[in-house]
């Protein structure tokens, strides 16, 4: 009886938590991690990892939508840049190198930062080369993104990628 009550309360709390999260535009990446085949506990399991502070911080910032990339930082510029115009401005990004029109440019969001920005191609290749999961290389990019942000065994690699990418950003200022 007690187990049933506990299970019911946990389910209710998870449902309320998810409902509240879905209302937040800032949690766009975090919300995208919840798919039908990924459990709630695997999404939050990275919080229990023993990682150095800076790695935990950067990983949490990315997942929670407060990593200082343009999708987030341009919320605070005046005048506010509309979210559909917060393009990636990294010097080696395709947006800059190819002189793309506005409708073809990539918005600098968490997905672009981790999966696509050519500024970080070398770092991304190094990270992918260290991933031991065979199934990772058979996934499409969306599935890879979710895998990278929900799998404990690669959390440290992803966090180190983020730290290294930000170090590279600072060297291009």
Question: Can you annotate each of these PLM segments?
Answer:
Residues 7, 13-173:
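Family-specific functional microsites
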């Amino acid at each position: 009886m007690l187990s049933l009550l506990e299970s019911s309360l946990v389910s209710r709390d998870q449902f309320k938590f998810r409902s509240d999260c879905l209302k937040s535009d800032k949690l766009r990446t975090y919300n995208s991690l919840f798919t039908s085949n990924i459990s709630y506990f695997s999404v939050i399991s990275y919080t229990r990892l023993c990682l150095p502070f800076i790695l935990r911080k950067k990983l949490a910032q990315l997942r929670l939508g407060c990593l200082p990339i343009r999708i987030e930082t341009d919320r605070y510029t005046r005048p506010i840049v509309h979210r559909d115009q917060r393009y990636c401005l990294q010097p080696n990004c395709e947006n800059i190198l190819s002189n793309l029109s506005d409708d073809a440019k990539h918005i600098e969001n968490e997905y672009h930062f981790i999966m696509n920005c050519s500024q970080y191609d070398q770092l991304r290749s190094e990270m992918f080369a260290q991933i031991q999961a065979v199934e990772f290389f058979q996934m499409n990019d969306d599935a890879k993104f979710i895998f990278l942000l929900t799998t404990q065994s690669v959390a440290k690699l992803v966090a180190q990628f983020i730290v290294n990418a930000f170090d590279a950003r600072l060297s291009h200022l």
